[in-house]
Amino acid sequence: MSLATAQSARGPAKRRFRDTQIEMAHGAGGKASRRLIDGLIAPHFANPVLDAMADAARLPFGGATLATTADGFVVKPLQFPGGSIGELAVNGTLNDLAVSGAKPLALMATFILEAGLDVAVLEREIAAMATAAGRAGVPILGGDTKVVEHGMADGMYVSTFGIGTVDARVRLDPESIRPGDRVLLSGPIGDHGITILLARGELALEADLRSDTRSVWPYVEALLELCAADIRWMRDPTRGGVATALNELIDGSPYGIALFEEALPVNDMVRGACELLGLDVLHIANEGQFLAVVAPGAEDAALATLRAMPGGERATCIGEVRTEPRARVLGVSSFGGTRVIDMLVGDPLPRIC
């Protein structure tokens, strides 16, 4: 989650940050992250572009609109089934641009390396970044490298910057959502977070599970070609998961969201791990999925388009915008039962990206 994702522009007035120390939860993408950004960081950097609080900043430039975004990656372990820190860094940055309606143009990367890091590991991650960027047709134009003493970093950290051009047809705005709009999800959730947990050996389970890390731009581009005017909002539900992303959307809104819990696409292994650990899959991070709120008339065509693409077969409608309850996400079961779905609290899975 980038700096801007912490608060919708319609959210409540910012409050002073009163925590006296930084804790792991401040980086988890949930309520603590929001307090840090709203109460400490954003007030110092306040400007009209930042105040829009989108996944990427939009800047008019020569008759076009540019989108810029930055991200940092501290995942542990560095390599895991389905990906690694290098691939994650590229895809995560591309995705922040994509869900802002921007075609990625270029990236930059900064490496913080720990003395003693095996050069073979560094080269592996640089190669992974080159492969992921090449797959997306996006060059990495430059960056920086710093080295810190042994024991002062966990092998390596990666920071990225991305720039893209916003499609002229895009009118993404949380305030544009209306009752009846559909909430679409591109595919199964929870794979990345649970994969990282298993890769650490913290759970005595064996599973054929892989991170979902990928660029979502091809899917977003297909939707823009199909129905750009009918797309109200998009977001990639990384840290904090689907629950946090949807709560950010309706924060301060006159509307709420009904989330159809039985419709959520979740792999059996992920569901089982969440039940075993007492985790809510809606709070688990994803690195290759996105949410889109679309006008009701666009739902069928949008889903058909996504499902026709490799990797989009399980795209589905998981909810709709409603007049009640205001500014809340309400989970609805197949039996008609309901529960309030809040943003992530705490940090159940630290350093997952």
Task: Please describe what each predicted stretch is.
Residues M1-C353:
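Helix-biased detector of long, well-ordered alpha-helical tracts
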